[in-house]
Amino acid sequence: MRPKLRIEDLHFWYGENHALQGISMDVQPNRVTALIGPSGCGKSTLLRCLNRMNELIQGTTLEGTILADGQDIYADDTDPVMVRRRIGMVFQKPNPFPKSIYKNVAWGAEINGYTGDLDALVERSLRQAALWDEVKDQLHSSALDLSGGQQQRLCIARTLAVQPDVVLMDEPASALDPIATSKIEETITELKKDYTIVIVTHNMQQASRISDETAFLYMGRLIEMSPTDQLFTRPEKDRTEAYVTGRFG
């Protein structure tokens, strides 16, 4: 099976800071891949390389190759806007637009020239994000009136509405309470039927619950990547074992 994403000898710098050093890994389709590691290890930097978000930051340099379905996303003739449409991003803090719930979901599709049934697209996206039943009678109310957990699921629906292949999530539940976090985790598990998901999390219990593969990063390097059950119970590297057992973090 061809990987959905293939990362080959990836190096990334913020100015002189060599933040990612020789990362090579595959992300399989319709799986949840978790990126774990201590703060500053490069998890979020790697995630943002996967849809060219980091190149919006001045003074950065990238070397290496990232392939999506076999195509180089950093090739000179590749439009970064199209990359970000195919590989969507959900951020750590919910960031709904100051618009109605409906407009939040429809906006991306509208600016991308969607010509299908917008009402159906909004409903489908909200259902996929497990939010439809909670908001179907208030679609034209402000998204800012929703709870934090609902706002984050709305942001997931907004990402899905542009019909990506891959969804990147940067600690999507870190600002939420346990009940809202559980709902997000259930949503992620359902979404992998239709999407490939890469998630950054500091919560190792969360990684073990929802991911199929886990990659452990430390000081900008990929230390180990394996099926999640194996990485948490039978890690191959001493440093991985020390991290997952809480001896350092």
Curated annotation (Swiss-Prot):
It is found in: Cell inner membrane. It is a peripheral membrane protein. Its main location: membrane. It catalyses: phosphate(out) + ATP + H2O = ADP + 2 phosphate(in) + H(+). It comes from the Bacteria. Its EC number is 7.3.2.1. The complex is composed of two ATP-binding proteins (PstB), two transmembrane proteins (PstC and PstA) and a solute-binding protein (PstS). This is Phosphate import ATP-binding protein PstB. The lineage of its organism: Bacteria, Pseudomonadati, Rhodothermota, Rhodothermia, Rhodothermales. The gene is pstB.
